[in-house]
Swiss-Prot record:
Subunit comment: Transcription repression requires formation of a complex with a corepressor protein (Groucho). Forms homodimers.
GO molecular function: DNA binding; protein dimerization activity
Source superkingdom: Eukaryota
Taxonomic source organism: Drosophila hydei (Fruit fly)
The UniProt record lists the keyword Translocase: no
Free-text comment on this protein's domains from its UniProt entry: The orange domain and the basic helix-loop-helix motif mediate repression of specific transcriptional activators, such as basic helix-loop-helix protein dimers.
UniProt domain bHLH: residue ranges: 10-65
Pfam families reported in the protein's UniProt record: Hairy_orange (PF07527), HLH (PF00010)
A GO BP annotation: nervous system development
Family annotation (PROSITE patterns): BHLH, ORANGE
Name this polypeptide is given: Enhancer of split m8 protein
Keywords assigned by UniProt, alphabetized: Developmental protein, Differentiation, DNA-binding, Neurogenesis, Nucleus, Repressor, Transcription, Transcription regulation
Compartments, as annotated in UniProt: Nucleus
Its job: Participates in the control of cell fate choice by uncommitted neuroectodermal cells in the embryo. Transcriptional repressor. Binds DNA on N-box motifs: 5'-CACNAG-3'.
């Protein structure tokens, strides 16, 4: 019979735990790196890459930065638009839901299809809502600029555009329709 010390038992138990923690840190850093590179490059394609492809892409990008031969970086100085950030987050969440459902034993295929089609419909509705909101805002801005340019300035006005601005009405969902929020 082989004698094992408390230290050996502790190491046997602790080693897998430490390995899981190390992998969790690596995955967290990879996700952070992925979003940072996507922000700097202005390319959302990297968000859909697997870990190895993303690391290779990050290495190529860093080499380009080091040598000064940076290929076109369209949005390097400007932060991503809130809508783009939301889209990326939503798609990452949908991918995570899909992954979890696929790895859950006993998960009904019909339930998975139902959830994924629901998420797709919601995403499509959100895009349509945003497009309608953008259109109404641009029409209101055009109408406002026409009204402001044609209105005579009074002696009390400063002559700035903000003097004639009125608050633009924000589109509200219908009474029966609830506005979806990701939180």
């Amino acid at each position: 019979m082989e004698y094992t010390t408390k230290t050996q038992i502790y190491q046997k138990v602790k080693k897998p735990l430490l390995e899981r923690q190390r992998r969790a840190r690596i995955n967290k850093c990879l996700d952070t790196l992925k979003t940072l590179v996507a922000d700097v490059r202005g390319d959302d394609g990297i968000l859909r890459m697997d870990k190895a492809e993303m690391l290779e892409s990050a290495v190529v990008f860093m080499r380009q930065q080091k040598t000064g031969k940076s290929t076109e970086i369209p949005a390097a100085a400007t932060p991503p638009m809130p809508l783009e950030s939301f889209r990326n987050g939503y798609m990452n969440a949908v991918n995570e839901v899909s992954r979890v459902m696929a790895s859950t034993p006993g998960m009904s295929v019909d339930l998975g299809k139902s959830v994924m089609s629901h998420l797709g419909r919601v995403y499509k509705n959100l895009q349509q809502f945003h497009e309608a909101q953008t259109m109404s805002e641009s029409e209101a801005a055009t109408e406002l600029s026409i009204n402001c340019n044609s209105a005579p300035l009074s002696p009390a006005s400063s002559g700035y555009h903000s003097d004639c601005e009125s608050p633009a009405p924000s589109p509200m969902p219908e009474e029966g329709e609830k506005l979806w929020r990701p939180w």
